[in-house]
Amino acid sequence: MRNISDLPNDLLVKILSLIPIKVAASTSLLSKRWGSVWKLIPTLDYDGTYSAAALEFFGKFHTLVALRFMKLTIEDVHSTTCFRSVKNLSLLDVKFSSDKTVERLLSCFPILETLVVHRWGADNVKTFAICVPSLQSLNIRYTVGGYHNPKTDHGFVINAPSLKHLDIVDHFSGFCSLVNMPEQLDAEIHLRHIDSEKLLESLTSSKKLSLCLKPQTGSYPGGDFDQLVCLELCVMCSLDWLNLILRRSPKLRSLKLYQSRERNWSCRNSKHVRTKWEQPNSVPECLLVSLETVKWILYKGTQEEKDVVKYLLKNGNFIKTMSIRFSSVVTLEERIHIPMEFEFMGRINSSRCQLSFSKL
């Protein structure tokens, strides 16, 4: 043990990071030299049941920058608990004693920048409130086995004025409220049950959006997406959102439409699928002055999809490239005929539009 004690702190910390935290903490009994070395561990994983005293204990890690709680229960949080150096926090299948416990826990991280929350339905929390002024990246997964009905009284309230990236996949919530959102935010939103109109009102300043939403249930009362440059949109459930966002996005340059098997959580097995395409009453400004790139992933060749592509080719004055990746349901004959039809449309509008086709 004397030879190990002669090693520099940096190397000892790396060694201690590879063993269970309880074992690492027990090394403090070996000698004075080991008394505080374990507190320098930068990343901590822990599972079990947390009392308020246990949380306060982990606040003694002076250089801890990443903390992951997984499959555990947090009973309470002392007001004096503080993780002053932690920038990355993961809450994975964590149960809490109440909604307030969530709020008290997150208030212990004054410089938190990245938060990952994975919920699995039975965590004793109805309103999961995330109020973190320093937060820059938020990743939320709220899923349950199968396709359960939503809990209308379960959901999220997010108040993060410094947020730069938001990624939500939510199969379960009845609501999601975004308050005090920053002017610039990239967001990836996949929602099964939540009415999306109000949520989108908080994202109108985004430059990049990736959306998979249930069909519109009412009129959209929000403003325009004046800063939106890149849009990814799942069209498996509804083409309504494409119409609306094209009309409201005067600076849009890149459009990606998809029905990817990996990314259609929000509308798989949906009872509300609606794929009817209705042309806008007037040509959206982005088609006339800014849209340059169009991609379609898992294109099936339905009449509605053909109508969309033809409309974009006819009215997209500045579209430089359009790439279409066929779904496996498209026959060989269709894969030959469709490019010929669209290439003719492209030549009518502009010789600068380069069309490409491929099989998934």
Swiss-Prot record:
Highest taxon above the source species: Eukaryota
> Which ranges carry the FBD domain?
276-326
Asked whether the keyword Repeat is assigned, the reply is yes
Q: Which Pfam families does the record associate with it?
A: F-box, FBD, LRR_At5g56370
Record keywords, A-Z:
Kelch repeat, Repeat
Q: Where are the Kelch repeats?
A: 140-186, 235-285
Domain called F-box: residue spans = 1-53
The UniProt entry, under PANTHER family, shows: EMB|CAB62440.1-RELATED, F-BOX/RNI SUPERFAMILY PROTEIN-RELATED
Q: What is this protein called?
A: Putative FBD-associated F-box protein At5g56430
What is the species listed in this Swiss-Prot or TrEMBL entry? Arabidopsis thaliana
